[in-house]
Structure formats: structure tokens, C-alpha cells
Amino acid sequence: MDRTSLKFRRNKMKRNIFSSALLIALLLPTIALAQVKVVITPQERKMAEAITAAQLRDYLYFIAADEMEGRDAPSKGLDITANFLAMMASRLGFKPAGDNGTFFQNIDVRVDSPDAEKTKLAVIGKQFKYGDDFVRVTGTGDASNRPLVYGGAGWLVKSKGIDDFKGIDVKGKIVVLSARGMPNMNNLTQRPAGVTPADLQGERGVEWADPLTYATKSGAAGIIVIANEQINGSWNQVRNAFGRTSLLWEKLRPDTARTALPVLLATTSVGNEIMNGISAGAVTDLKPNASMTVAIKSEKKKTRNVIALWEGRDPILKKEMVAIGSHYDHVGVNPNAPGDDKIWNGADDDGSGTVGVLSIAEALAKAPVRPKRSVLIVWHTAEEKGLIGSEYFNRFPTVDIKNVIANINIDMIGRSKKEGDTDPRNKDLSGPNGTFLIGAELMSSTLGAVTLGTNNAYLKLDYDRKYDDPADTNRFFFRSDHFHYAVNGIPAVFWFTGVHEDYHQPGDHADKIDYVKMEKISRTIFLTLWELTDLKERPKVDKQLPPELTRR
């Protein structure tokens, strides 16, 4: 799962299918959940039993082996994994559905990484050390010997009376912000308390502005975000996260990595240097000057989605597809990481989803009968770099995207909270019979009815729906690959067993996976997929959509 984003992109894509589908839905009677009755036949149960814990274990130990070097996008280990997935799809009898009759969809990207030697920060003449004292967040450029000005959290939300730069002249200065949540290039600080996405209406930069937009529009020379205690307490992880490469899809995304205002994240000790001698809250315009230089290194590379088609049996319905996918990349190797383990194996994130999809593909191939509709499998690349693979596929599909009736996404289904576990990092991890179900009823009543009905008729897993709460700050629905299908007007549902102590850490190993739980979840997803392929009519978008899915 993509950590650094909460990355829904306001990229101006217009998806008229949303508004038209929603209008039709409003004119028709609401579909009652009871109208979709799911019955699992003995034959279907037998088909699901082709998925086994042993099978999942064997595949995952290969996918998450040290030899794959953490499956960074792009990397040799990721290419090996892609070739393995394509080979397995071919052996199982799937049709290639990528570019030019292959299983691959190639994506040209630019790979950026921080230039630690050239990225510098000095405050009142004191030089700080990259990595130990500060890291790059985004942007490039120089801001030499500039005054510092404190700008709070940096937000403007006129409808809520919030203006953190009110009365402050930031032009030509380096703005100091107090961290609120983990910074990323879309939100350097989290939205103010009580502000929802629905409040961010009107022209961006005028009626409302995130800190980067507000500082840029106000003429600031650079930004330093000062870590809070939570960030400071996990500085090694923070340093590793911001030290990794990032990808730019040059032809279609703005080159914010180079053109954005230079932004650094600094430790609290650096913040103390900046705030030294200043009475907190009494003075905003600070006396000290600072100099910052932010630089990156770049190279051109390719990365690939892996796409396969299992054709349905119905002569009419087989033109329609249920898409099921996962991301097969992780975050690679960090030679500067503390300790002996430098490889982020990504067994749970998202090796578990990758092999879960593979096991479902194998169950389809072993079934005595084909589904009515076709099944499209997409193993997405570069989810960890900003949902790049899924966005690319949805903007440049290798199949007729209008015929994709639903999307199933599997991202992190391998871990269980053990009895007596008091580690706060595991507080939201699901139990041995549980999983979080996200988005099932967000867009379509029918998708929700099939998803919930299948579980009730089968293994009765404990589905936790808490992340569907619009007020939930994790915003998981907007952080994995199903999001771009939803943007395309395709109802999507997401299985996820929760974050844990090894999330985006080198300890995410295959020997920590609960394979019995993975088996249960994968079997349930297989049958959910099967029931969707068997529907008389495709699921309609009949729900009031959140702003992130309509402002395109």
C-alpha cells in the first residue's frame, strides 16, 4: 500500500460516466440489498478449495525472497517477478492482454532520488547533516541567506475562517511549518481539525490552499517542516522512506519533483535551533536567516503492468469483465538503513495480494466450467510510487475499459493480530478470522450486496467496515490501486487486513504470514469474483459519490 501519499490526484480528468450513472441511479428506485441473494453451490465451494495455504506459502516465499531485492519499481527483482507472473498466467491458459499480444504493459518513467551530497541546510550559519538532521520532501532549488518566517501549519480554508499566513509576509522567505501528520508532496501537513474534503471547494489557491500551494502562491522561497514528536520518534523509518526513489510519469504528470518549491523535513532539534530565543506563539517573523539547497538525481527507465484475460463462457456476457488485481511492487533496498537487514521484502505489502490473485487465477483455470463473464487480472506496478501502474492502465487501457463492470483489489491480506499483542503498532491489525472490507458499498449497492452476501453464505469472515467512515483520517480507499478504477466509474472493493509493526519495514518477511487466514480470504474473494461474473446485469453506480471521485 502506498504510504507517502494519501495520494488522490486532482489531475483534471473528466469522468462523465460518474455524473451520468449517478443521475440514472437517482431516477430509478434504490436497489435493495435483499434483491441480490447469493447462494454458494457445492461445486463453487469445491472450486474455491483449489486455493490452499501451502500453495500461497510456496508462491510468497518466492515473491518475497531476498533475491527479489524488495521488488522496487523499477528493478531487476521486479522484472523477475513480472516474468514469473506472466509465465504462470500463460501456463494456466490465460490470454495475454497487454501491449502487442504480450502479458506486459510498458510504462516509461523517470526515476528520481535525493542527491544527499548536494542537498544542504544551514541555519544561522550552522550546517546540518542530510539524513541525520533533515531529509528532502519534494522540489529542487536554492534559497540562500533568506529570512525565516513561522507559518503554523500553512493552511488556507476560507469557508472555515482558517488562514495560517494571515498578517505574515512570506514572500522571498523560507517558511517554517509545524508538522501535523506525516508530510508528503500533496499535504505537507494534514488538514486542520474539522476540515473535510467537502470543505475544500472553490478555486484552489484562492478559496482554499494546502501548505505547498499557499506558500508557492505567496512567493515563499522554500519550506522547512519541523517534525513533531511522533515523527521524531521514528526518524530512522522517516529517513528511509524519504530516501527512496520516486517515479515521474513525465508525459502526463507535471514535473513537480523539479519545479515545486523546495521542501525539507527537519528534526525537532533543528526546529529548536530555528525557534531558539523566540517566545512560542508571541512572535511569528523570526530573526534568524537560513540557506537551503535541494537537489535530485534522475535517470530514464521502464516498468510494467502484468495483464492477463480469462475468457468467459457466455457468448454475450463474456465481452464484459470483472477486474481483479494487486500491486506486485514494494520499496526495494536501502543500503543506508540501520541494522543488518537492508531489504524490504514486502511479504505482506503486497506479496500477499500478489499471490492471492495468482491463487485465484489458478482456481479459475482448474474450475470445471468457465465463469459467464470474463476475468481480467492486472498485477500493477509502482503502487508504492504513487499508484502509477493503476493510473496508467486506467488512462491507457489495453482492453475496452467500458466493459469492466467491477474491480477487486487485494492489498495486504497476510497478517493477524495475536492474542496478548500489546504493541501499539499492531492495534489496528485484524484477527485470525477478520479483515477490513473497504468501499464495497461506496459506489454500488449491488457490489455491496454481492460482496457481503458471498461472505455470509460462505465462511462468514469478520468484515470490519470502520475504514469506510468518511471521517476516518487514514483514507485507505484513496491509497491503493482500486482508486483509479473508481475514478473511471468502475465500482471497486478492497480487502486489507491492517497495518502492523513491519509495515514498510525490513521485517515484512514471509515467515510472519498467517497462511490459513490468507487461504480463507482468498477463497472468499474467489467466490465473490465468481458471483460478480454471474450477475444478470452489471453493478450500477447508485450512491452519492465523495468529492475525490467527482472532481476530475
Residues of each region from the PLM?
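Soluble metallo-hydrolase cores and metallopeptidase-like ectodomains found primarily
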Residues: V38-E44, I124-G167, K251-G346, E362, ...
